[in-house]
C-alpha cells in the first residue's frame, strides 16, 4: 500500500505502470485533439464557451488557452505548448504532437520491460545530435523582402485560408520593414492592430501612419486636411479642480465673475499659444493643422480652435502618443512653455471616417513612418479575431527570421532529414540508450505524417516516398500538400523559423523525459482531507 495512504486514507494514488499509463493516455488524448489542425490543410475547431460565445480557430495556441483541460498532465503539456508560442510565436501544435509521439514510442519499449530512465538517456543523446544537425541545415541568408514574404506566408497559411494569407503576408512584411531600424531590436508594439467590422477580410491593409478609434468632437471642424502639421501633446485644455482642497469666498457677483474669467484665462492662454503657432507655420497657405491631445479639451477651446481651422482630437490613448511621434515626427509636449515649430510632426493626409456610430481618424502619408497600423477588416467578430491571431503570429515569424538571420526548410523536410541523421548516429550511442534514440527519430516523423494525412494522402506511402527521395538526392525534401509527392522545400520557398525548431527540440525532450520518469501520482491536497 502507498505510504501516503497511511497518512491520508482519502488520497488518490496511481503507481508505476498505472501512473505512466495515465500520463501517456493524457498526452495522446491532447495530441488527438490538435492532430487535425497541423499545416495549411488543417481543419478548424469550433469552441463554444459557457456563455455561448463561439470561436472558430485552427491556431493551437488559441485552442489550448480557451479549452478547459481537467487532466493535470494534459494541462502541463498545454502550458508548455502555449509557453512555446509566447516565446517564439509558433510551434504550439507541433509541440503537443511531438510530446505525445515521444511518449507513445517510449511506451512501446517500456511495455517490453525497458526502464524509462534508459529511454530518457537516449532522448538526451538524440536531442544533442538533433540540435547539432539543425545547426548544419539552417540556411543563413540576407533577409530581403522576398525571403521574409516566404517565411510569413508559410506561417500565415497554417492559420487562415490561402487567398487571405497572401493578402496578409505583404501587409505583415511591409509593416515590419517600415518599423525596422538598423542594429536595433524590432519593437512589435510599434505596429498597431486596428479592427474594423466592415467589408471582407481580403480588404485588410497596411496604413503607413496611424488610425485612431475616435474623431473630432466639434461639428464644425474639418473632416479632411492635407499637408498637415501635427501637434502631439499631453496638456489639459479644460478647467480642472486644483489638486489640493482650495476654496474661494466672494462678497459679490462681480468678484465671482472675476474668478471665472481668471480660470478661463488660464486655458485661453494655452489655446492662444496653439493658434499663434498655427498662424506662424501655416501663414496664408492652406496647410492643415491638427492637435492630438491625451487630456481633455473643453467646448470653448474646441470652438476657438475650430474657428481657426484647427482639427483637435482629445483623449487619445496613451499607447498612441508614442506611436504618433514615431509615425509623424515631432515631440510630444507636456507643457506649452517651449512651444515651437520644431515640436511639430507632419502628415500628408488626415481624415475622419465614419462607420455606423463609430468614428475613426486616419493619419496617413507620413514621411518615413517608424510606426504603422495594420487595419484588419472583416464581416463579423469571428473573422476579425481569427485574422488578428494570425497577424500576430505572422509578425512574430518575420521578426524571428530577422533576429535569427537564418531559416530552415519547412513542410516536414527538417524532421525527415533529422530522423535519418539520428538513425545513422544510433550505433555511436552506447548500450540500450540506442532504443531511446530510435524512439526519438520515429517520433519526429509525426510532423510529415500528419501534414500528409491532413491533406488527404496516405501517410505511410507519402512518408516512404519522401524518405526515399531524401536518401537518393541528399536534399531536404518535404511534403507537397497539393500532390502528396516529395518537393524540395527551399526551392518552393517554404521556410520555418530556426528558433521555433530549436525551442521545440528543447521543450519536447524536457517534458517527455519528466513525464516518463513519473512513477507515482498523488492527489492528496488539503481539499481531500476535509469531511
Curated annotation (Swiss-Prot):
CDD domains: TCP1_zeta. Its main location: cytoplasm. It is found in: Cytoplasm. There is a cross-link at residue 251 (Glycyl lysine isopeptide (Lys-Gly) (interchain with G-Cter in SUMO2)). Pfam families: Cpn60_TCP1. One of its GO terms (molecular function) is ATP hydrolysis activity. ADP binds at residues 39, 91-94, 158-159, 411, 496. Keywords: Acetylation, ATP-binding, Chaperone, Cytoplasm, Hydrolase, Isopeptide bond, Nucleotide-binding, Phosphoprotein, Ubl conjugation. GO terms for cellular component: chaperonin-containing T-complex; cytoplasm; cytosol; extracellular exosome; microtubule. It catalyses: ATP + H2O = ADP + phosphate + H(+). Mg(2+) binds at residue 90. Its EC number is 3.6.1.-. One of its GO terms (biological process) is positive regulation of telomerase RNA localization to Cajal body. The modification N6-acetyllysine is found at residues 5, 199, 287, 365, 377, 388. SUPFAM superfamilies: GroEL apical domain-like, GroEL equatorial domain-like, GroEL-intermediate domain like. The modification Phosphoserine is found at residue 205. It is linked to De novo genetic variants in nearly every subunit of the TRiC complex, including CCT6A, have been found in individuals with a broad spectrum of brain malformations, and clinical phenotypes ranging from mild to severe epilepsy, developmental delay, intellectual disability, ataxia, and other features of cerebral malfunction. Belongs to the TCP-1 chaperonin family. Component of the chaperonin-containing T-complex (TRiC), a hexadecamer composed of two identical back-to-back stacked rings enclosing a protein folding chamber. Each ring is made up of eight different subunits: TCP1/CCT1, CCT2, CCT3, CCT4, CCT5, CCT6A/CCT6, CCT7, CCT8. Interacts with PACRG. This is T-complex protein 1 subunit zeta. It comes from Homo sapiens (Human).
Amino acid at each position: 500500500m502507498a505510504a501516503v495512504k497511511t497518512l491520508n486514507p482519502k488520497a488518490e494514488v496511481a503507481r508505476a505502470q498505472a501512473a505512466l499509463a495515465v500520463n501517456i493516455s493524457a498526452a495522446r488524448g491532447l495530441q488527438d485533439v490538435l492532430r487535425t489542425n497541423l499545416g495549411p490543410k488543417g481543419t478548424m475547431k469550433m469552441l463554444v464557451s459557457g456563455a455561448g460565445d463561439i470561436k472558430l480557430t485552427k491556431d493551437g495556441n488559441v485552442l489550448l488557452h480557451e479549452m478547459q483541460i481537467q487532466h493535470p498532465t494534459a494541462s502541463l503539456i498545454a502550458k508548455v505548448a502555449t509557453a512555446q508560442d509566447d516565446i517564439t510565436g509558433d510551434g504550439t501544435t507541433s509541440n503537443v504532437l511531438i510530446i505525445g509521439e515521444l511518449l507513445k514510442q517510449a511506451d512501446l519499449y517500456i511495455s517490453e520491460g525497458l526502464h524509462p530512465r534508459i529511454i530518457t538517456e537516449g532522448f538526451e543523446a538524440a536531442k544533442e545530435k538533433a540540435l547539432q544537425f539543425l545547426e548544419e541545415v539552417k540556411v543563413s541568408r540576407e533577409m530581403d523582402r522576398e525571403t521574409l514574404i516566404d517565411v510569413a506566408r508559410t506561417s500565415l497559411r497554417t492559420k487562415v485560408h490561402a487567398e487571405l494569407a497572401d493578402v496578409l503576408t505583404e501587409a505583415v512584411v511591409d509593416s515590419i520593414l517600415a518599423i525596422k531600424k538598423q542594429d536595433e531590436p524590432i519593437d512589435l508594439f510599434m505596429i498597431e492592430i486596428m479592427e474594423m467590422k466592415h467589408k471582407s477580410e481580403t480588404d485588410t491593409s497596411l496604413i503607413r501612419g496611424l488610425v485612431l478609434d475616435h474623431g473630432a468632437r466639434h461639428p464644425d471642424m474639418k473632416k479632411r486636411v492635407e499637408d498637415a502639421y501635427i501637434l502631439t501633446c499631453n496638456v489639459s485644455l479644460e478647467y480642472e479642480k486644483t489638486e489640493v482642497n482650495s476654496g474661494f469666498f466672494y462678497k459679490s457677483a462681480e468678484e465671482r465673475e472675476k474668478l471665472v474669467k481668471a480660470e478661463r484665462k488660464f486655458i485661453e492662454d494655452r489655446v492662444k499659444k496653439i493658434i499663434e503657432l498655427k498662424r506662424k507655420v501655416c501663414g496664408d497657405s492652406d496647410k492643415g493643422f491638427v492637435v492630438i491631445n491625451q487630456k481633455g479639451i473643453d467646448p470653448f477651446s474646441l470652438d476657438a480652435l475650430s474657428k481657426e481651422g484647427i482639427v483637435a482630437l482629445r483623449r487619445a490613448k496613451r499607447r498612441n502618443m508614442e506611436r504618433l511621434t514615431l509615425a509623424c515626427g515631432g515631440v510630444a509636449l507636456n507643457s506649452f512653455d517651449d512651444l515651437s515649430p520644431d515640436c511639430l510632426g507632419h502628415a500628408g493626409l488626415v481624415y475622419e471616417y465614419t462607420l455606423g456610430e463609430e468614428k475613426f481618424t486616419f493619419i496617413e502619408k507620413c514621411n518615413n513612418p517608424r510606426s504603422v497600423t495594420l487595419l484588419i477588416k472583416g464581416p463579423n467578430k469571428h473573422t476579425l479575431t481569427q485574422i488578428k491571431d494570425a497577424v500576430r503570429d505572422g509578425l512574430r515569424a518575420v521578426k524571428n527570421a530577422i533576429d535569427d538571420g537564418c531559416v530552415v526548410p519547412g513542410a516536414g523536410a527538417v524532421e525527415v532529414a533529422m530522423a535519418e541523421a539520428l538513425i545513422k548516429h544510433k550505433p555511436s550511442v552506447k548500450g540500450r540508450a540506442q532504443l531511446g534514440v530510435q524512439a526519438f527519430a520515429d517520433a519526429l516523423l509525426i510532423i510529415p505524417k500528419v501534414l500528409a494525412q491532413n491533406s488527404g494522402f496516405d501517410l505511410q506511402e507519402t512518408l516512404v516516398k519522401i524518405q526515399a527521395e531524401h536518401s537518393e538526392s541528399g536534399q531536404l525534401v518535404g511534403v507537397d500538400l497539393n500532390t502528396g509527392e516529395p518537393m524540395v522545400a527551399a526551392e518552393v520557398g517554404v521556410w520555418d523559423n530556426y528558433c521555433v525548431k530549436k525551442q521545440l527540440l528543447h521543450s519536447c525532450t524536457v517534458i517527455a523525459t519528466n513525464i516518463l520518469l513519473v512513477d507515482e501520482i498523488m492527489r492528496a491536497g488539503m481539499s481531500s482531507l476535509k469531511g
